[in-house]
Amino acid sequence: MSIKKFKPTSPGKRYMTVASKEEITREEPEKSLLAPLKNKSGRNNQGRISTRRQGGRHKRKYRIIDWKRDKDGVPAKVASIEYDPNRTAYIALLNYVDGEKRYILAPLGIKPGDKIESGSKAEIRPGNALPIRNIPVGTIVHNVELKPEKGGQLARSAGTYCQIVAKEGKYAHVKLPSEEVRMIHLDCRATVGQVGNVEHENIDLGKAGRARWQGKRPSVRGVAMNAVDHPHGGGEGKAFVGRKTQYTPWGQKSAGYKTRRKAKKSDKYIVKKRNQ
């Protein structure tokens, strides 16, 4: 994938870059794999803001992705590579020999016509999904499960991957994109290869309007607010925070303070923390 630049015919296009989308082979999605998606604008069921800075995005439909990859022993053929507005990665449409169609995350290097399989007997090839016990140590994987049969949860964004670094007993040591090393059960599944669209991190939106199309609203600094709205607010002129450290709008420390619970159940599965 390459990045496309524009001539500076306007201030918004001066630094704007987009993905060339050379890999995409189909414009219209598969209708049987679409679902309605309502824009909640960051509101909960009471209509109150639960997630700030969201709203006003372009209408879109959800693409139903096969996270579990549980169709064992049935080969499939990659029909097309498609754009998905709901995620940074591209998606691949699979046509199984029994007639079923499913979407998966498009791994790096996959193309229409490639053969894809799932199950313990599948080959170690990009796009194939296997239990971790059947994947050699050192292999790069993505869409990794945390619990068997729950569906992939780790390394699903564009360009991300995990690496199996060791196997011990019932667990494998997996290095995550955050550099954290975590123990994951050998029966959990993972897909071989790296997620495609690796140049996504280098894309420059170029103007505020493109962010608004994505549903991102402006972020207002706490020091620019009134004292009633934020712990950093108030004061005469451009006043400083006025406290020893920074705080969230709800009064919790947000700098120099560990916000993870000290006795979390998943701590026993973490071999190396991401900040060590």
From Swiss-Prot:
Ranges of Basic and acidic residues composition bias in the record: 20-31
One GO CC annotation: large ribosomal subunit
Pfam family, one: Ribosomal_L2
Gene Ontology MF terms: rRNA binding; structural constituent of ribosome; transferase activity
Key words, A-Z: Ribonucleoprotein, Ribosomal protein, RNA-binding, rRNA-binding
SMART domains in the cross-refs: Ribosomal_L2, Ribosomal_L2_C
NCBIfam families listed in its UniProt record: rplB_bact
HAMAP family the record matches: Ribosomal_uL2_B
Name by which UniProt lists this protein: Large ribosomal subunit protein uL2
Organism, scientific name: Natranaerobius thermophilus (strain ATCC BAA-1301 / DSM 18059 / JW/NM-WN-LF)
Upper taxonomic lineage: Bacteria, Bacillati, Bacillota, Clostridia, Natranaerobiales
Record gene name: rplB
